[in-house]
From Swiss-Prot:
Source species of the chain: Rattus norvegicus
Domain of life from the UniProt record: Eukaryota
Protein name: Phospholipid-transporting ATPase ABCA3
Nucleus found in the keyword field: no
Localization of this protein: Endosome, Multivesicular body membrane; Cytoplasmic vesicle membrane; Late endosome membrane; Lysosome membrane
One of the Pfam families matching this protein, by short name: ABC_tran
Assigned EC number: 7.6.2.1, 7.6.2.2
InterPro entries: AAA+_ATPase, ABC2_TM, ABC_transporter-like_ATP-bd, ABC_transporter-like_CS, ABCA, P-loop_NTPase, R2_ABCA1-4-like
Glycosylation sites (chain numbering): 14, 53, 124, 140, 228, 620, 945, 1350
Expression tissues: Highly expressed in lung, moderately expressed in stomach, intestine, and kidney and weakly expressed in thyroid, brain, liver, spleen, heart, testis, and thymus.
One GO MF term: ABC-type xenobiotic transporter activity
Gene Ontology CC terms: alveolar lamellar body; alveolar lamellar body membrane; cytoplasmic vesicle membrane; intracellular membrane-bounded organelle; lamellar body; lamellar body membrane; late endosome; lysosomal membrane
Membrane-topology descriptor: Multi-pass membrane protein
């Protein structure tokens, strides 16, 4: 029941996601229909010709050899060979045969057949042998007679001589080779008569090659040998002639030939995109950790697969139903693509193929954890599994049944074989029917359609088993691997016996063993929800082991929130991942609600709620759908779901976002939703990994309240980087450092252990005197310590024992506040932040902020002294201009940034190295780029050579028994006695051979026509020969009629007649058994045959196109991923020129393209393909390939703009390449076949398709090959030249000729299109289009803007904001050039269903050395402002100027003057931190000699040195932010934009970042910063504005805003109430009494937060009162500060409506 419910839920999820991905779904439907459409279109275009009357053929005389043989061969006469030469009888018969013919001929005996074969192979005169008669008897003596039962075989030349070019449209038709003795019928049957225009039956040439004449002559000679006189008498009154069966009225349909060859390929291409989509969808879920997240929520793996399978199956069912409809529906009078086949069987076949394709895609997906890589390799494998068909098709008749079945283990081959069978049944005229399911097409074959269906289903099962096994043993990055033999373990099938936690483990206090003073006693009265015992995790990094967690032992209790703290990389996320079963612990145990994590994960997951660090949301599900989905997944009933979801939406405050898709939510809302998912359906164990990162202050508070409410009966584990959050929420706080647990206890316990006393924090004014402050503090409190000096903050530690001196100190500070330049100050007891920093410092001195700051500055001082010999007044910590400023100062003096050509070259080099690094790091991709084309071509050439490695034909007995039981009609219209006699003998003879003689009383030919039209295709297998005995004057004419649909019926028919005559002469025991055993090929012929490959040029081109389709689309991957993560935007902002960016990429990609191209030449050389390797044609081929590269790469760049995910781009562009190359190439090639009669249309299409590089390449390669071979043939001999002229076979002397088959137009087209695509690319990217875009957008949006601005509330504007506006609106020219950033009435409207005014007329001027803070709630318009300022979004109205240049008109110049750190890290995973900084340093134009020093400084200043040489993808979130900030700061741009730079950083890193930013500011840079951390804004900003609904609501320095919008003090106190409410109430009463007018702002658990209004309150006084009250009211901890910025910020909260879209 549960299973069904989960299955239904997953199906609903998959269906909803599919429904929302409209384009993908449409493409999946459209592509199969497109390929079916191509067939329908061809069906309509290819005219079938109706032949209304029966076709009747004339008699064929076999008494004489054809005329061709009356001309002697070059250099001699024809030879008639016989074996064995020592037998007189053999010689006699052969001589008799020679005398029978009128031409000059000599007899040549060979002692054994081997001698004869050697003669044929190696003797140059062997081509003169007309035929050899080989008797299959052992003649011991020369005089031994010939027995009555004669057995012999005729050996004619392998290559036919009397062969005329027939106009089949393909010069070198494979079928012209050999005698087809391996098969009885053609591989592909034809619906009309075979070779309708040849009365002699055409191939393999029994009549025209003289085979029947020789056969009849030998048979007559045998009769004369045994009964000379009576034979002589018989043949005087009897003549034997042959005749072809008449053919009933039929429709001549060249389309059936096209379909037999192309149906498999088109079906395979139809499912390519579906296959790639499946692989991508499944792996993307794995890559985004969604699959593992669902597993953590209690979903079993097999259900996950079943749901995917059912969804894709249902979808495929729709697709194949449409395809069946298109194939079987009659498009014009009684003609469909498959006119005769049973639609239900066609549907069954396509469905079986779809099922096996789905299973195949599943199997491929298990080997990958990255969607890009999976789609790349998966697509290649999909094609790769089709290639064996190229080997199978030509060898089909030689293969045994088991070989055919084995090759069907690849589903694509099985499908191709099935499609081929459908084509054969269609051509046979019956179509495939259910009754034919177990019957082969004809007697030749032993393979039937039922076996194909069976194999497709078997493949699906096998692929499914591989999927199951691989997923269990290699679950990828996330998941617990099973041992390789897991399926043999009973525990796998029956489950583990439940491990009961041992009594000693239950009772034992885990922390006793190593209890130190830093671990607080455990609560006695609470149950432990999670017990962790000695848990360790070791990671393999390269060859080294890296300790992730070392021996962690910890209890987490129900009803409590346990907070886990640690700097980035301390092991918090690792611990959570082990507890949730994402990866297994290396050693140790953990029990969650009594279940062990490595054994009972299934049980544990039922009660687990998880909110991971990264959002694991489905982009296309709405908020409510997420909650529904996960609630039901955890087991909530459908009935209770709506209420629970409604409740949760209310709790989260997301009611208005109920129906928004998650991809449109802002970062903060996504976090809320993730927490909601963790909480929903009453999860008992919650694990929240940084749940509030990226939220604004209001949202964060809401989440705190939510967690406090929800914790009562749950065990909650939470990690965070916000110390106030830890302090407020944590009942117990555990701190990890370097993978080890350092301490654990309540926040109070930790503060007592680690606290050093009180902290006094001062915010400096620009003219501040830090020295003076320091002296003053030390005067009052001698043992005070300077704690940190970061940004605008100074903080001192005042020891507890000096409390009595504080009042006088504070009084003095208040008095001298102006004089010392103090903006504001506050004091607090030990904070959690301090505890955290102290713990870090004890474990690792590199975490000590002062220790870090000093050496960094010292180092810079030394560098400056040595490198630039500049003196500086560096006075340690107190000097404000250092750090990154170290480089800044020099640059003003010495360092001149590169400009002009030098800058362009430097940028080009930087971009080129970026591409090179990508290839180097993504070596698998490069390997695929090289191997795919080489493999494809090698396989194609192997298949072609394998085909052309023509086997010598086997012997074939010319007897009806080969065909099974057949009907032999005969008629005796004459009255002669001989005729009657013969007919009776015939009846007896046939019955003895188990054949069915049938006497026809009327006209025999009419009977045959009637039977053929009644029986249809089956007639050709049941009736192969017929005979008539009629009188012609004195003579009786015996006619051997043969059904020409079978290859060997002429000789078989004659053999029956000759046998009949022999029996008549010599009695029933007489018989002649004849076989056709063609001669082996001579070495000369073998060499010649190598070239006569039918579709070799076509095959080479086709495989090359398949390879190129995959190769070309890889060039889009980096382009898309750079754009998606905004790295490209940041590079442009850093000053890269468009041409530099794209041309460097093009150059590298052309070099990457050259490597496989050269290897392709090597392959052609290895296979010695003359067309491409002789006469200097290798250079031509290389030119073709490189021109293709030059055309296709820019096209891929252009098309990459349509995609936002690299994997999507890769799959869709591969499909585009297949369509634009293979599909167009096949269509044009089919239309060029003369029989199809569409040459004119093919020429038109060929010209239309010239814009597609893929088409040009395919046609050029194919034409080049064909032209070479035709030219070589036509100039090989006079006869050949005569033939070529006679049949108008054209070739070009100049390969580059314009007209077909020259390749001039393709070459020119590729050369031109490369240039055109590049020009288009530059137009899209450059200012020209940018300006046009700005103009058009602005034009369209201005009226919307005016309308919206009229609507916005007419609130009076704040005075400061108005002053700033007027300052900006009337600027002087000097001030414009001097002011780094001026924003003038900037507005932005987003066109949505309801147009959104995101930014509304903001004006601002940011001066040098100023750090301006943009504050606002999520959705206030901060990020949109940044996007406009950096040129990512167009401006609706207004403008902005950077260094005097306008953003609307001079975006290029503007970008050279700005640094930008976007909200989400715009980093390239494949580079190291150092490489990225070096790249951006080059982009900025820092001279090469200084780059290393500059990068070193930046790394040191941001504490990134230990990580400098690691790949960015291995960085933690905090380190990525540091690197992004470093990139913005490097090269000293005039204006720096930082969008939430410190998100996700731990406190140490955050302070270092502030330091760095402050130094940049002090060196004269203008900085604009947005942040959710008010602390950060106070530390860094000189001025700030609070944005609400796209407008500035207030503006000024932090102190100014605090004084204006909030006066008095802020008091936060934590009371030790121990759950007794009255204790807290007493304290609250005390505050109300002592500070009249005080307002209780906030109350959380035991924490109260008051606003103390006070004009008359002095800080010293407040402090004094609280010190005294501390003991009395049990105040654990309090802090008094001037009103904080956060409170000012929150006072604007009510003005901001609920947010709309991400970051706007």
């Amino acid at each position: 029941m549960v299973v069904l419910r989960q299955l239904r839920l997953l199906l609903w999820k998959n269906y909803t996601l599919k429904k929302r991905k409209v384009l993908v779904t449409v493409l999946e439907l459209f592509l199969p229909l497109l390929f079916s459409g191509i067939l329908i279109w061809l069906r309509l275009k290819i005219q079938s010709e109706n032949v209304p009357n029966a076709t009747v053929y004339p008699d064929q005389h076999i008494q004489e050899l054809p005329l061709f043989f009356s001309f002697p061969p070059p250099g001699g006469s024809w030879e008639l060979a016989y074996v064995p030469s020592h037998s007189d009888a053999a010689r006699t018969i052969t001589e008799a045969v020679r005398r029978e013919f009128m031409i000059k001929m000599r007899v040549h005996g060979f002692s054994s057949e081997k001698d004869f074969e050697d003669y044929v192979r190696y003797d140059n005169h062997s081509s003169n042998v007309l035929a050899a008669v080989v008797f299959e008897h052992t003649f011991n003596h020369s005089k031994d007679p010939l027995p009555l039962a004669v057995r012999y075989h005729l050996r004619f030349s392998y290559t036919r001589r009397n062969y005329m070019w027939t106009q089949t449209g393909n010069l070198f038709l494979k079928e012209t080779e050999g005698w087809h003795t391996a098969s009885l019928f053609p591989l592909f049957p034809s619906p009309g008569p075979r070779e309708p225009s040849s009365p002699d039956g055409g191939e393999p040439g029994y009549i025209r090659e003289g085979f029947l004449a020789v056969q009849h002559a030998v048979d007559k000679a045998i009769m004369h040998y045994h009964a000379n006189a009576s034979a002589h008498q018989l043949f005087q009154k009897l003549t034997v002639i042959t005749k072809r069966f008449p053919f009933p009225p039929y429709i001549s349909d060249p389309f059936l030939i096209a379909i037999q060859y192309q149906l498999p390929l088109l079906l395979m291409l139809s499912f390519t995109y579906t296959s790639l989509t499946i692989i991508r969808a499944v792996v993307q879920e794995k890559e985004k950790k969604l699959k593992e997240y669902m597993r953590m929520m209690g979903l079993s793996s097999w259900l996950h697969w079943s749901a995917w399978f059912l969804m894709f199956l249902l979808f495929s069912l729709i697709v194949v139903s449409f395809m069946t409809l298109l194939f079987c529906v009659k498009v014009k009078k009684d003609i469909a693509v498959l006119s005769n086949s049973d639609p239900s069987l066609v549907l069954a076949f396509l469905l079986c193929f779809a099922i096996s394709s789905i299973s195949f895609s599943f199997m491929v997906s298990t080997f990958f954890s990255k969607a890009n890589m999976a789609a790349t390799v998966g697509g290649f494998l999909y094609f790769f599994t089709y290639t064996p068909y190229f080997f199978v098709a030509p060898r089909y008749n030689w293969m045994t049944l088991s070989q055919k079945l084995l090759s069907c283990l690849l589903s694509n081959v099985a499908m191709a074989m099935g499609a081929q069978l459908i084509g054969k049944f269609e051509a046979k005229g019956t179509g495939i029917q259910w009754c034919d399911l177990l019957n082969p097409v004809n007697v030749d074959d032993d393979f039937c359609f039922g076996q194909v269906l069976g194999m497709l289903l078997l493949d699906s099962v096998l692929y499914g088993l591989v999927t199951w096994y691989v997923e269990a043993v290699f679950p990828g990055q996330f998941g617990v691997p099973q041992p390789w033999y897991f399926f043999l373990m009973p525990s796998y099938w029956c489950g583990n016996p439940r491990t009961v936690v041992g009594k000693e483990e239950e009772g034992g206090d885990p922390e006793k063993a190593f209890r130190t003073e830093y671990f607080e006693a455990e609560p006695e009265d609470l149950a432990a929800g999670i017990k962790i015992k000695h848990l360790s995790k070791v990671f393999q990094v390269g060859n080294k082991d890296k300790m992730g967690i070392r021996d962690l032992t910890l209890n987490l209790y129900e009803g409590q929130i346990t907070v886990l703290l640690g700097h980035n990389g301390a092991g918090k996320t690792t611990t959570m991942s082990m507890l949730t079963g994402l990866f297994p612990p290396t050693s140790g145990h953990a029990y969650i609600r009594g279940y062990e994590i490595s054994q009972d994960m299934v049980q544990i997951r039922k009660s687990l709620g998880l909110c991971p660090q990264h959002d694991v949301l489905f982009d296309n599900l709405t908020v409510a759908e997420h909650l529904y989905f996960y609630a039901q997944l955890k087991g909530l009933s459908v009935q209770k779901c709506p209420e629970e979801v409604k409740q949760m939406l209310h709790t989260l405050g997301l009611e208005d976002k109920r129906d928004s898709r998650s991809k449109f939510l802002s970062g903060g809302m996504k976090r809320k939703l993730a927490i909601g998912i963790a909480l929903i359906a009453g999860s008992k164990v919650l694990m929240l990994d940084e749940p509030t990162s990226g939220m604004d202050a209001v949202s964060r508070r809401a989440i705190w309240d939510l967690l406090q409410q929800q914790k009562s009966d749950r065990t909650v584990l939470l990690t965070t980087h916000f110390m106030d959050e830890a302090d407020l929420l944590g009942d117990r706080i555990a701190i990890l450092a370097k993978g080890e647990l350092q301490c654990c206890g309540s926040s109070l316990f930790l503060k007592q252990k680690y606290g050093a006393g009180y902290h006094m924090t001062l915010v400096k004014e620009p003219h501040c005197n830090p020295e003076g402050i320091s002296q003053l503090v030390h005067h009052h409190v001698p043992n005070a310590m300077l704690e940190s000096h970061a940004g605008a903050e100074l903080s001192f530690i005042l020891p507890k024992e000096s409390t009595h001196r504080f009042e006088s100190l504070f009084a003095k500070l208040e008095k001298k506040q102006k004089e010392l330049g103090i903006a504001s100050f506050g004091a607090s007891v030990t904070t959690m932040e301090e505890v955290f920093l102290r713990v870090g410092k004890l474990v690792d001195t590199s975490m000590d902020i002062q220790a870090i700051q000093l050496p960094a500055l010292q180092y810079q001082h030394e560098r400056r002294a040595s490198d630039w010999a500049l003196d500086s007044n560096l006075c340690g910590v107190m000097d404000p201009t250092n750090g990154i400023g170290a480089l800044i100062e020099e640059e003003e003096v010495l360092v001149k940034l590169n400009t002009g050509l030098a800058l362009h070259c430097q940028q080009f080099w930087a971009m080129f190295l970026k591409k090179a690094a990508y290839s180097w790091r993504e070596w698998r991709m490069v390997a695929a780029q090289i191997l795919v084309p080489v493999t494809c071509l090698t396989l194609a050439l192997l298949a072609i050579n394998y085909t052309s490695e023509i086997f010598d034909d086997p012997p074939l007995k010319l007897s009806l028994n080969e065909y099974g039981t057949t009907v032999v009609p005969f008629s005796v219209p004459g009255t002669s006695r001989l005729g009657q006699q013969l007919s009776e003998h015939l009846r007896d003879m046939l019955q003895a051979e188990r054949q069915e003689p049938r006497e026809v009383l009327g006209d025999l030919e009419e009977f045959l026509v009637f039977r053929a039209s009644v029986e249809g295709g089956g007639f050709n297998e049941r009736c192969l020969v017929a005979t008539s005995f009629k009188d012609s004057g004195e003579r009786t004419v015996v006619t051997a009629l043969f059904n020409n649909q079978a290859y060997h019926s002429p000789a078989t028919a004659l053999a029956i007649v000759d046998n009949l005559l022999f029996k008549l002469l010599c009695g029933p025991r007489a018989s002649i058994e004849i076989s056709n055993y063609p001669q082996p090929r001579s070495t000369l012929q073998v060499a010649k045959d190598q070239f006569n490959e039918g579709r070799k040029g076509f095959d080479i081109a086709l495989n090359l196109l398949i390879a190129m389709a995959f190769l070309a689309s890889t060039f889009s991957i980096l382009a898309v991923s750079e754009r998606a993560v905004q790295a490209k935007h940041v590079q442009f902002v850093s000053g890269v020129h468009v041409a530099t960016f794209w041309l460097s990429a093009l150059l590298w990609d052309l070099i990457s393209f050259l490597v496989p191209s050269l290897l392709l030449l090597v392959v052609f050389r290895a296979f010695d393909v003359h067309a491409f390797t002789r006469d200097g044609h290798m250079a031509d081929l290389l030119l073709l390939l490189m021109l293709y590269g030059w055309a296709i790469i820019p096209l891929m760049y252009l098309l990459s703009f349509f995609f936002s995910a690299a994997s999507t781009a890769y799959t869709r562009l591969t499909i585009f390449n297949i369509l634009s190359g293979i599909a167009t190439f096949i269509v044009v090639t089919i239309m060029r076949i003369p029989a199809v009669k569409l040459e004119e249309l093919s020429r038109t299409l060929d010209h239309v398709f010239l814009v597609l590089p893929n088409h040009c390449l395919g046609m050029a390669v194919s034409n080049f090959y064909e032209n070479y071979e035709t030219r070589r043939y036509c100039t090989s001999s006079e006869v050949a030249t005569h033939y070529c002229k006679k049949y108008n076979i054209q070739y070009q002397e100049n390969f580059y000729a314009w007209s077909t088959p020259g390749i001039g137009k393709f070459v020119t087209s590729m050369a031109a299109s490369g240039g055109i695509y590049l020009t288009l690319l530059f137009l899209i990217e450059t200012n020209l289009l940018w300006r046009l875009r700005t103009f058009v957008c602005a034009f369209r949006r201005r009226w919307t803007l005016a309308e919206l601005q009229n609507r916005t509330s007419v609130l009076p504007e704040d005075q400061d904001v108005a002053d700033e506006r007027s300052r900006v609106l009337v600027p002087s020219l000097d001030s414009m050039l001097d002011t780094p950033l001026i924003i003038n009435e900037l507005s932005k409207v987003y066109d949505q269903r309801a147009p959104l005014l995101a930014v509304d007329r903001i004006s601002l001027a940011v001066q040098k050395g100023e750090c301006f803070g943009l504050l606002g709630f999520n959705g206030a318009g901060k990020t949109t402002t940044f996007k406009m300022l950096t040129g990512e979004e167009t401006i609706t109205s207004g403008d902005a100027f950077v260094g005097g240049y306008s953003i609307s008109s001079d975006i290029g110049k503007v970008r050279q003057r700005m640094g930008y750190c976007p909200q989400f890290d715009a980093l390239l995973d494949h580079m190291t931190g150092r490489e990225m900084l070096v790249m951006y340093a080059r982009l900025r134009g820092i001279p090469e000699r200084l780059i290393d020093a500059c990068v070193e400084n930046t790394l040191r200043g941001l504490l990134l040195e230990p990580h400098a040489n690691k790949l960015v993808k291995t960085y933690s979130g905090g380190n990525k932010r540091k690197l992004s900030t470093g990139i913005a700061l490097i090269g000293e741009p005039a204006v720096i934009f930082l969008d939430e730079p410190s998100t996700g950083m731990d406190p140490v890193a955050r302070r270092l970042l502030w330091d760095t930013v402050a130094r940049a500011r002090e060196s004269g840079k203008a900085i604009v910063i947005t942040s959710h951390s008010m602390e950060e804004c106070e530390a860094l900003c000189t001025r700030l504005a609070i944005m609400v609904q796209g407008q500035f609501k207030c503006l000024g320095s932090p102190q100014h805003l605090k004084s204006k919008f909030g006066s008095g003090y802020s008091l936060q106190a934590k009371v030790r109430s121990e759950g007794k409410q009255e204790v807290l109430e007493e304290f609250k009463a005390f505050v109300d009494l002592t500070f009249p007018g005080s307002v209780l702002e906030d109350e959380h658990q035991d924490m109260v937060h008051y606003h103390l209004p006070g004009c008359d309150l002095s800080w010293a006084k407040v402090f004094g009162i609280l010190e005294k009250a501390k003991e009395k009211y049990g105040v654990d901890d309090y802090s008094v500060s001037q009103i904080s910025l956060e409170q000012v910020f929150l006072s604007f909260a009510h003005l901001q409506p609920p947010t709309t879209e991400d970051g706007r």
